[in-house]
Amino acid sequence: MNVYAIRAIYHFEMARARRTLMQSLIAPVISTALYFVVFGAAIGGRIPHVEGVSYGAFIVPGLVMLSLLTQSISNASFGIYFPKFTGTIYELLSAPVSYYEIVIAYVGAAATKSVILGLVILATAAFIVPLRIEHPVWMVLFLVLTSVTFSLFGFIIGIWADGFEKLQIIPLLIVTPLTFLGGSFYSINMLPPVWQTVSLFNPVVYLVSGFRWSFYGLADVDVWVSLGMTCAFLAGSMAVVAWIFRSGYRLKT
């Protein structure tokens, strides 16, 4: 394994994040904090507790997941698309660096930025709503797995996109609606039975449910099922990335 190449790409991506700190960290934290203030502090005070947890605290895991998913995709997709746009990716592909080393570097940097963002949002939420973490190891596990999985997904989008506007199509039109409908602001047990069943086809339900369980011991889906679905999506994303590099899809043309 070419550790020097991985480290060089990783440091380059992290340096880019530092140069765009307002966009990559401060803006998502402020926008999520507004959710905490409006839904948690203002409206949440008028809503009964959800399964023994205040509404403001209940929505924290879902809002963290919302930021985590969108930023993981955005970080990774732009990170790999920009070299495609400028043509420098061909220098990278012709260098003595294997495909999996490229993926480790880009996805590792995107996941690192997302984990940092998630932790900062949690720290911010602790000042606004009462927050407790019953299973910190599981919390970190879901945080890291989700960041890596959706960074891989973002990497795929960055390879697929042939224009800057396409980088935002899937996050805006698919990921964000799925997150809002995935139990971020409510428990799916509040829904009629038919819609509970329909919700189980939403992959974000498993992410939010498992992440919320790590905080309060409350889950819409068994935590092991949530973990299994997360790992399955991770494996699927890895398989697609492997196929992309084997076939040269959108890389050799």
Language model feature labels by segment:
Residues 1-136, 141-253:
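Hydrophobic transmembrane alpha-helices and immediately adjacent juxtamembrane helices
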